[in-house]
Amino acid sequence: MKTLYSLRRFYHVETLFNGTLALTGRDQETTGFAWWAGNARLINLSGKLLGAHVAHAGLIVFWAGAMNLFEVAHFVPEKPMYEQGLILLPHLATLGWGVGPGGEVIDTFPYFVSGVLHLISSAVLGFGGIYHALLGPETLEESFPFFGYVWKDRNKMTTILGIHLILLGIGAFLLVFKALYFGGIYDTWAPGGGDVRKITNLTLSPSIIFGYLLKSPFGGEGWIVSVDDLEDIIGGHVWLGSICILGGIWHILTKPFAWARRALVWSGEAYLSYSLGALSVFGFIACCFVWFNNTAYPSEFYGPTGPEASQAQAFTFLVRDQRLGANVGSAQGPTGLGKYLMRSPTGEVIFGGETMRFWDLRAPWLEPLRGPNGLDLSRLKKDIQPWQERRSAEYMTHAPLGSLNSVGGVATEINAVNYVSPRSWLATSHFVLGFFLFVGHLWHAGRARAAAAGFEKGIDRDFEPVLSMTPLN
């Protein structure tokens, strides 16, 4: 085993001074951490830490499988997914499994298979986690040097980073292959109201793909969240997968440059803080994606977005009053602006009333009625199809505005359905988790930097309350 320095030197955070750093146990005497400090006891025990990570993966996959089967068991095909509190089946449906035209579920068997596969996988991971936590070697460096590591070994750390990047790249390409070769994925923009299709004409132009990154994050622009066709999404995954795999190979083959060795803190806690920071960013981006994007998260499965429900309400009443004889092109509303239609700041014809603020919504049921200058008056008079009316009435009554006690829908909409949209659940949970991960990032980054600077003492364990309490046994 390569020991680059004394272990005492390597672990700067000073905890209990018991004179030994024997890498045995699970107790406070040998590790300096009490049982409730969790994986801190395993900082120098690579074998045990492997067990903790594999067991954690097993718990995650077990939840996925069990929750998947729970949703299948409770699923009612006659109701939309978003009315049933489902968050996993919409993801499977978006990948094209079990659904047909219009997002109608025609076969639940693929969902059952997915749940069972995850349960079986979780059993394998659970066994591996228990094995490595209880029976396997405490450290991997001696017996399996390829899997062993020392936190300070910069070259080994970037090799591990490279392996992770390659795995992420393979994950991105799995979606690409599903969309191109294995049955396709669900396209909410398919003519007539959405269908499963294979993606044939990928967007690989770097100016388009990386153009998303250069967009403003604000309304009408919307950064990467504004993507609204599957060719761009799958093309983006080709780019991302390629970059991850090439970057992974690069990190495996190279050693960190001098500037990187100087700029970064190279300790286990520092790597933890970097990972938490990255996950926090992912959480915030996912929050915005599921809240605003109805292409990657089709409204047929997740329910309408907030702007979509609002625009659908305006559209529904335009249809109703036009049938009753209103001239929707010129009718004046209570504020003197157009009651049904008005102009946006840049001159497009948009829906009037309170929904004017959502004028940059794009949705598959609405786009056929647009012309070169926004909503086309002649199309609104002649071309509205029954499926567009049905869908907008459905979305109008299912705004993603439910609270925890489920007083759902727009307050002024008497037909609103009492439910909490999966968009609300997923956006809120990812925002909250993203925030907590960010706090964890700051906490561990601060500790890691202080330890590297040599002045982190940790909690003074002489006066720690738990030490003066009666032992549990």
UniProtKB/Swiss-Prot annotation:
Transmembrane intervals: 69-93, 134-155, 178-200, 255-275, 291-312, 447-471
Gene Ontology biological-process entries: photosynthetic electron transport in photosystem II
This protein's GO CC annotations: chloroplast thylakoid membrane; photosystem II
Keyword Transport belongs to the record: no
Bilayer topology annotation: Multi-pass membrane protein
Cofactor binding notes: Binds multiple chlorophylls and provides some of the ligands for the Ca-4Mn-5O cluster of the oxygen-evolving complex. It may also provide a ligand for a Cl- that is required for oxygen evolution. PSII binds additional chlorophylls, carotenoids and specific lipids.
One Pfam family of this chain: PSII
GO molecular function: chlorophyll binding; electron transporter, transferring electrons within the cyclic electron transport pathway of photosynthesis activity; metal ion binding
Subcellular location: Plastid, Chloroplast thylakoid membrane
Propeptide: 1-14
Keyword Manganese (UniProt): yes
Recorded family membership: Belongs to the PsbB/PsbC family. PsbC subfamily.
Quaternary assembly: PSII is composed of 1 copy each of membrane proteins PsbA, PsbB, PsbC, PsbD, PsbE, PsbF, PsbH, PsbI, PsbJ, PsbK, PsbL, PsbM, PsbT, PsbX, PsbY, PsbZ, Psb30/Ycf12, at least 3 peripheral proteins of the oxygen-evolving complex and a large number of cofactors. It forms dimeric complexes.
Name the record gives this protein: Photosystem II CP43 reaction center protein
Organism this protein belongs to: Glycine max
